[in-house]
Amino acid sequence: MIHPLAITMWDFSWIERRWDGAGFEDWNAALDGVKERGYDAVRIDAFPHLLSQAPEKEWLLLPVWYSNDWGSPYKVRVRLFPALIDFLKACRARRIKVALSSWFREDADNVRMALSTPQAMAKCWIDSLRLIADAGLMDTILYVDLCNEFPGDFWAPYFRNDPPWMTWSCWHTDAAMDYMRTAIALVRQEYPDLPYCFSFDGENTHFYRERDLSFFDLAEHHIWMTKLNKQQFYHEVGQAKDGRFTEEAYHLLADHALDVYHGKEKYWKQLLVDGIQTLAADAKVAGLPLATTECWGITDYKDFPMLPWGWVKDLCALGVETACQTGQWALMATSNFAAPQFCGMWRDVAWHQRLTAMIHKATLPPEAEKTSLGRAMRWE
């Protein structure tokens, strides 16, 4: 009998943040930290659009933001092959499963814009999976999320929805559904044993009931208290003039977040509980086991003056406890920040161990056993 797995998100940081002190300069040490804290899996960006184009090329990546601590805050050069293979080998040596996703990071030539068709999307993933298969490492792969938070325009600028203004959380349109269905079908033809999905975020989880996602093997959905009720928490903290992914946004958090949170703490906690329970109920109707690798309290945070971790850890613990009680999650993270670059979160080993133990004791959704996900969660 398998149990739900504890997973952490290492996004594109696993290869972008390799300068001294950035957290991933020593993969062996970082992965030993994963095992020590009780995690079973990591979710990373496989950069399939670049691997497919030229596996051994040194790519110049442009920063997606300067304020957050995911990825590099400045342009950075990476060589993905054989780096991905080396990373997967290090994971397998520790019996750590790897979920593959992509944020489709922008390089100097903006190669990602060629993925406007599902056929192009499928090809880049097939080419990338072939490299992994040729290395004999397919047993390490937990699932493939073809695009992070599709069709958000940060990560899927190549996709034109119908209507075009429908980007974040708007996966339910006919155009988006057709794109996802076709891309997954083509990849599945080549690699039928892997679980597949596109990951989503947003409050419109009722579409799990209304749209046919039977071509998914799991629903990876990202949920945070701060984005519920139309991002009420962020509105009360204050909106940065130049957007959320900025230093101004962190200044507003430092000045106001604790007061806003503690001013009606019970309300914010109940908002999170209600959101998790609603998501679980909607996924159950869809017949899909849930995976959540980005969650539960606040979306953007880091080690910063006047930004303590205590309230974030409290909310995340509540999120894990609530999700475990639903019995709908097969894969569960503890936060957005279970990674070595977030020192204030990562160094609390006992906190991670307590939450990963809670995840391991939860009930596995029966839907997981009915798909390839249940098989991928096991080590032979």
Predicted features and spans:
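Aromatic-lined substrate-binding rim segments of carbohydrate-active enzymes
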Residues: 23-107, 119, 130, 169-197, ...
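Active-site groove signature of glycoside hydrolases
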Residues: 99-112, 126-171
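Structural preference for beta-strand elements that scaffold enzyme active sites
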Residues: 2-6, 41-43, 95-99, 139-145, ...
